Structure formats: C-alpha cells, structure tokens
Amino acid sequence: MENRMNELVSLLNQYAKEYYTQDNPTVSDSQYDQLYRELVELEKQHPENILPNSPTHRVGGLVLEGFEKYQHEYPLYSLQDAFSKEELIAFDKRVKAEFPTAAYMAELKIDGLSVSLTYVNGVLQVGATRGDGNIGENITENLKRVHDIPLHLDQSLDITVRGECYLPKESFEAINIEKRANGEQEFANPRNAAAGTLRQLNTGIVAKRKLATFLYQEASPTQKETQDDVLKELESYGFSVNHHRLISSSMEKIWDFIQTIEKDRVSLPYDIDGIVIKVNSIAMQEELGFTVKAPRWAIAYKFPAEEKEAEILSVDWTVGRTGVVTPTANLTPVQLAGTTVSRATLHNVDYIAEKDIRIGDTVVVYKAGDIIPAVLNVVMSKRNQQEVMLIPKLCPSCGSELVHFEGEVALRCINPLCPNQIKERLAHFASRDAMNITGFGPSLVEKLFDAHLIADVADIYRLSIENLLTLDGIKEKSATKIYHAIQSSKENSAEKLLFGLGIRHVGSKASRLLLEEFGNLRQLSQASQESIASIDGLGGVIAKSLHTFFEKEEVDKLLEELTSYNVNFNYLGKRVSTDAQLSGLTVVLTGKLEKMTRNEAKEKLQNLGAKVTGSVSKKTDLIVAGSDAGSKLTKAQDLGITIQDEDWLLNL
C-alpha cells in the first residue's frame, strides 16, 4: 500500500504541474479525479503513511483564526521605479561606471503579491507576505493551496525563495461570473482578487480560486553566478519561472524588448505592469549593494498608465500630518486600469497653476504607477469660460492662515494644534508600518479625538476598555481586542516607535538603520548631527531633521510620558559591537562543511560582525572554505584573499 501511495502522489503532482504550470495536460479530468479519489481512500486507511507533498493537502477545509506576524530572515527590498527610456539609460550609466562589461537580465514584472517561501530539508515550512519588507504575515496554509508551489522539493534543501503570486485572467473572469450570479460585489482587477484570496481565513476558498506563482529569486545565499543560473535552478527544483526574459549588455536591446512586451502584454494570460531589469552577475550585484530602500543593481520600468478623460466637478483641500494641504479633484466617474475612478490628486498649488486647471475643465486622468489616480493635463479644446480656481488662504481644518514657503510647491498649515494634522499623526502612529495597533484606524482615531479622549500619541496608552466602550459602535469584544493591541504595541522594537513619531524625512528603513546603530531611542535623541549623518545610507538631511525634532521641549515631554507607560525604547533586532572580532569584514562561505550547517556558520560569522556574501570579489576580506570548494576558492587564491577552514571558524 505504501508503494502505491507513493506512486499516486508522484503521478498526481506531475499531472497537476502539466495542467497548472505547463498548460499541457496528458490525462483527462476524469482520469485525474479517479486517481485522486484512490489516494484519498488509501490515506484514510493508512494515515501513518501520508506524504508531506501529497496533493490532498491542497484541498482546503481549514478555517484559520488569523495570520501571525513573520520576521523575514532576508529583507524584501522595494525596487527603484523608472517611467522613461532616459531613466533606464541613467541607470545603465551608473552601473557601467563601476562595471563596464555588465549584462542585464530583463524579466516581466508580474502584477500580483510578493511572497517568500522557506523550505527546511526540502519541505515547505513557511510562506509569508512581503509586509513592510522586514515583517510580513505567515500565510503558509493558504500558499499550500496554490497548485504550482511545491510542498516538498526533490532535494533535501534549506532554502528561501521569492516570487509573485497572481491570479490568471481566466480564473479572474470565472470568479467574477460566479460573484455576479450570486449578487455579490465583483473584484476590480486580478491583483485585488489575488490579495483578497491570500487573506482568506477559509483555505477551501483559496484552493478553489486557482492562484499561480512565478519565482524569481533565491533570497538565501546562492552558489550560482548569474540571475539566469538562479532562474534555471529554481525551475529544476520544480518552481514555476517566467520564460519571457532577455539577457543583454545593451540598454537599447533591453528597450526593444520592453517595447515588444508592452505591445503584446494584452495577449498574456496574466497581468504585468512593467519590466524588471537586473544586473545578471551575482558578484556584481553584491558589490553594487543596496540603498536604504532598494538594490542599486535593479530597476523596475513601469509601463505608461492608461489615460481617460473626465470632468472636474469640484475640489477638496485636505491637511496631512505634516501640515501639507493637498488638493483632490472630484470627477465624473471613469473606468481606469480595472477600477472606477471618481477622485484624483492635483498634487499642489504650483501644479494647478502650471497646468491652469479649473473647475469644470475636461482633464486627462491616469493612474500614477498604476495605483494613484492623478490629473495629467487639461483638454483645452473642451474649455468653456471656466473661472480660475480659488486657492484657499485659510486651513480647511483649523482656519489658520496657510503659508507657501519659498522653494516649496505645497501650501502648509503651520498650526501644531490643527485637528486634521493631529488625527493624521495619530493614525500614522498606529498604522501597520509603525506601531501596528490592530483596529486603531482613521475612523477610530476620529471618534476618540472628537470625544476628547486622545490628543497626542501618549494618550493612546492612557485609554482603558471603559473609554473605548463610550464610543458609538464599539462593543466589549472589539474594545477588549483594541485595548490588548495597544498594550502589545508597547513591546515593539524601537524602530517602529521612531517611524510612528512621524519625523520628516525619517521613513521605516531609515528608522531601522538608526536604531541598529544607536540601539536605544534615548541614545539616538542625544546623538550629534555628525554621528547620524555618518551612517551609511542616511546623510545630512535626515540628521538635521532628527536634531530639530529632538531638541523640542514638547518632544522631550512626550518621550517621558511614553517611558512612564512602559513603551519599549530599545532596538530588539540583532546588533553587533563595532569591536566584534570580524567587524566590518566581508566573508564568503564555500564548499561542504562537516561540523556545522551553512546557516549555523553564517549566523556565527554575522554575530562576530562579518557581512556574509555569496560571491568572491576584490571587496572580499576572507573566505571560509570547506571540502570541494571549487571555483570560489580558486578565485580567492588568485586575488590573494585570506583563506580559513571550518575548524578556524569553530574555534573563534
């Protein structure tokens, strides 16, 4: 029986791959179903012999309580965007200045959700969303229901891979046909449908919706020399990879590829929103490194957005948390990039003046980056004596006089007690990338502020369940959940708190770099501008902004209050002393280790202050070589790099 179960699992997984990944089934649906039912019966009779990669694991049936947070071992960076050929040429010049012979890999930018898959001994252990790049959500059970994600690799590997989970156009249409028939609201586009599906608590629905993936990266250190090699290796492991790609050192040829794909994209069975261009050499990628936000060795070209004409009916002016007043046009509704658009940003007063935008104008509307609706220009041929738009002189929230600083494009309200600014700051503090207080969204902030229960972020930690129960629509269960979420946020690592304070120019990545360096929010608040500016990836603008913020008396009082409520000020990630034994050294692991795993060796090196990379280059300081080290050892010897063995590492 065990042999038959093994045979059925192997056959069914192969047939599923042919159907879902290769679009080339070799058996009929009825034949597949017959074999599947046979396996189900055998597994009922012999549960002790169920294999971890059995296709029956994909059927669903679980109802999850929620999704736990997941700390990514390897951060998921954003990509720098490009919207023109000129920006790609500038990227090429930056790369070629360091590596004149660099070649690029151009790949399709799939319009889906980024996911990370971690395998231990070849078995899928964790599937997670991107989140903020450092912390995502554990959606393993849902990703197990995606038919082209292997549950078990043929090799006993420890590996973390990255890819895009998407909904094919055919599956999207089928879902919306069913929703229409049931009188339910349809999904606006395949990306929204994929996102909604991956956040389902009922895994049976996930299994039914036929999501798919394309893998594009090994996040864990790779022995491969090029991105092309990585993609071939991923495919050999059983992952789906996209075959629409091009390798070339010529940006002109890359541009021709982009033009061809853009022309043909509508015929693809899935949505794409651009082309990702990466330096093909892994060694060159390592040397080019990263900025605070993105790799220096990659860029994402975004296709020009779809454009539609609409009439401006009116304009709303709103105040953000930094006091910037933003105009938003109310439009006659139009369908744009799969969604109904009735509002679009006008950016700022200088933009309105430059484009001569007036109420009643017919304007061209597009989605910037396929996300944010914006007004591109006025269709002057359709203008009929519209009056020049009145620019507000007073803040729409507090009535204070607005200012237009020299050199800035935005109007600002500089009243620190402006109600809208306070509410926006409070909502930002509680947001996912900041203190991540579940249930503490803008609508709750509005209710609490209007009830005079909160006026600054410290007030959040004064709230009781009884306070929350005084608000309309808040019952005991939700009040208790919100209260516990507030208490739980006190234990966040301090970079979340720093970002939540909303300091100008200090984003989430900069917050993490700052706390990695200083370890404690108090120490950061007392640091000199020079010491902050010297941190790689930051600089003078951020240093000055922090210095200006922390020297305010009210900020010092706020920090004292947060301390009194036991809000954590310490960085909880790994910090390495600058006088650690290998501090500042770049180290490469190669060959087979006998007494420790590669991950154990990597962790030990990092704890000793080393930066562990996957490729040998002139920037490598040290190589730790096991048996069968191969070409990396040879290259290290040619470059005169110090070479140590496993015993040396064990004795450190």
Curated annotation (Swiss-Prot):
Disulfide bonds: none annotated. It comes from the Bacteria. InterPro entries: BRCT_dom, BRCT_dom_sf, DisA/LigA_HHH, DNA_ligase, DNA_ligase_AS, DNA_ligase_CS, DNAligase_adenylation, DNAligase_N. Its cofactor is Mg(2+); Mn(2+). One of its GO terms (cellular component) is cytosol. Zn(2+) binds at residues 395, 398, 413, 418. NAD(+) binds at residues 29-33, 78-79, 107, 130, 164, 278, 302. Its EC number is 6.5.1.2. Keywords: DNA damage, DNA repair, DNA replication, Ligase, Magnesium, Manganese, Metal-binding, NAD, Zinc. Residues 577-652 form the BRCT domain. GO terms for molecular function: DNA binding; DNA ligase (NAD+) activity; metal ion binding. The active site is at 109 (n6-amp-lysine intermediate). It holds the Pfam family DNA_ligase_OB. It catalyses: NAD(+) + (deoxyribonucleotide)n-3'-hydroxyl + 5'-phospho-(deoxyribonucleotide)m = (deoxyribonucleotide)n+m + AMP + beta-nicotinamide D-nucleotide. GO terms for biological process: DNA repair; DNA replication. DNA ligase that catalyzes the formation of phosphodiester linkages between 5'-phosphoryl and 3'-hydroxyl groups in double-stranded DNA using NAD as a coenzyme and as the energy source for the reaction. It is essential for DNA replication and repair of damaged DNA. Belongs to the NAD-dependent DNA ligase family. LigA subfamily. This is DNA ligase.
